[in-house]
Regions:
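N-terminal basic, low-complexity leaders that serve as flexible interaction/assembly modules and, when applicable
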Residues: 7-13, 28-32
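Glycine-/charge-enriched secondary-structure boundary and capping motifs
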Residues: 2-9, 25, 114-132, 145-152, ...
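Residue-level detector of flexible, active-site-proximal loop/helix-junction positions
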Residues: 20, 51, 64, 140, ...
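Short, acidic (Asp/Glu-rich) active-site segment that either coordinates a divalent metal cofactor
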Residues: 151, 164-209, 249-252
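Short, glycine/serine-rich, charged loops/turns that create anion-binding
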Residues: 49, 105-106, 183, 247, ...
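Glycine-rich phosphate/pyrophosphate-binding loop regions near the starts of catalytic domains
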Residues: 27-182
Length: 347
């Protein structure tokens, strides 16, 4: 009888151990990641005793089919930043400071070089978010995933003090401000890939100065941790919404009270080139608004009297913004988000 082994079924324990060793080398070089316990059964984190009435807040997310763009471009250095960003940007909406992050990588066949690029991005994202990479899991799934493909999931825990869920005091005429995104972030890529496939588009085609389509699509998701937490602490903003899958249309209502609705002026939008390029293939305005962030990765709501403080704070973080609308009484409008004007898709 032929002897069977785990490696003969397509899973290499030795390669997995080597990958963990490579990650440990990276971790040891970075003093900011000293809390990490890569290779252990679990990770531990000591909560700061100075935090009054601590409440732990958790978030989990992935990066969708943006991974396929990274694979097509053979560039996996920033996809890990996206993974961290998608989780921490959700946490900060609820005023939680990111504490630690864990990752999960699933692949048909482990490629150590590719894996190091992915982990390198995750580490960079954690540093940008001021949180620890506490651990993770890398799994080979032969015959389930194809050899050159992989998927990612991230898990982040943060902390805040006070009540578990306080409803913000939103009022009519409060200002709605869009904070600029770096691009598509990590949503809408299935539609983008359909456009690329059906139109036989080459990712090395230049559409913006010296930037190719592939480079614009791979721009890592903006991490808003520092500016948003700063503005919450200084009571500059009342609430915010992370604009992900579902676009402004689906995400902004999640941060609104039942007594108010959002009125958005599309004429105020400054659309980056990549969104104009996508729309040029016949994507309607409504579809754009409920699929993509359309240039604003985070939307904040504030009292008009706080505008000067907001401008000073956001400029110190070198982020661009636009006042895109205001809140109205829900009795005056039958939608949680209504739009006036049209997006300018022309150059």
């Amino acid at each position: 009888m032929k002897k069977l082994s785990y490696s003969s079924s397509g899973v290499s324990i030795n390669k997995g151990n080597k990958f963990v060793s490579e990650i440990k080398k990276i971790i040891r070089k970075d003093k900011n990641l000293k809390k990490s316990n890569i290779g252990g059964f679990s990770g531990q984190f000591v909560l700061d005793s100075k935090i009054k009435k601590p409440i732990l807040v958790g978030a989990t997310d992935g990066v969708g089919t943006k991974i396929e763009i990274a694979r097509m471009m053979r560039d996996h250095k920033t996809i890990g930043i996206d993974l961290v960003a998608m989780c921490v940007n959700d946490l900060i909406v609820d005023q939680a400071k990111p504490l630690f992050f864990l990752d999960y990588i699933s692949t048909g066949k482990l490629d150590i070089s590719k894996g190091k690029e992915i982990i390198g991005g995750i580490i960079k994202g954690c540093k940008m978010s001021n949180c620890s990479l506490l651990g993770g899991e890398t799994a080979e799934h032969p015959e389930v995933d194809s050899n050159d493909k992989y998927d990612l999931a991230g898990f982040c825990v943060g902390v805040k003090s006070g009540v578990a869920k306080a409803s913000p005091k939103l009022r009519e005429n409060d200002i709605i401000v869009g904070i600029s995104s770096s691009g598509l972030h990590s949503n809408g890529y299935s539609l983008v890939r359909k456009i690329i496939k059906e139109n036989k588009i080459k990712l090395n085609k230049k559409i913006e100065k010296n930037k190719t389509i592939g480079e614009l699509l791979l721009k890592p998701t903006e991490i808003y941790v520092s500016p948003i937490l700063e503005m919450y602490t200084k009571k500059i903003i009342k609430t915010c919404a992370h604009i992900t899958g579902g676009g402004i249309t689906e995400n902004l209502p999640r941060s609104l009270n039942k007594n108010v609705s959002a009125k958005i002026n599309l004429e105020t939008f400054s659309l980056p080139t990549i969104f104009k390029w996508i729309q040029s293939f016949g994507v309607s305005q409504n579809e754009m608004l409920k699929t993509f962030n359309c240039g604003y990765g985070m939307i904040v709501i504030l009292d008009r009297t706080k505008l000067n403080q907001f401008e000073k704070s956001i400029k110190s973080h070198k982020l661009k913004y636009s006042i895109i609308g205001n809140l109205v009484n829900s009795k005056k409008i039958n939608k949680k988000v209504s739009y006036i004007g049209k997006l300018n898709f022309n150059d």
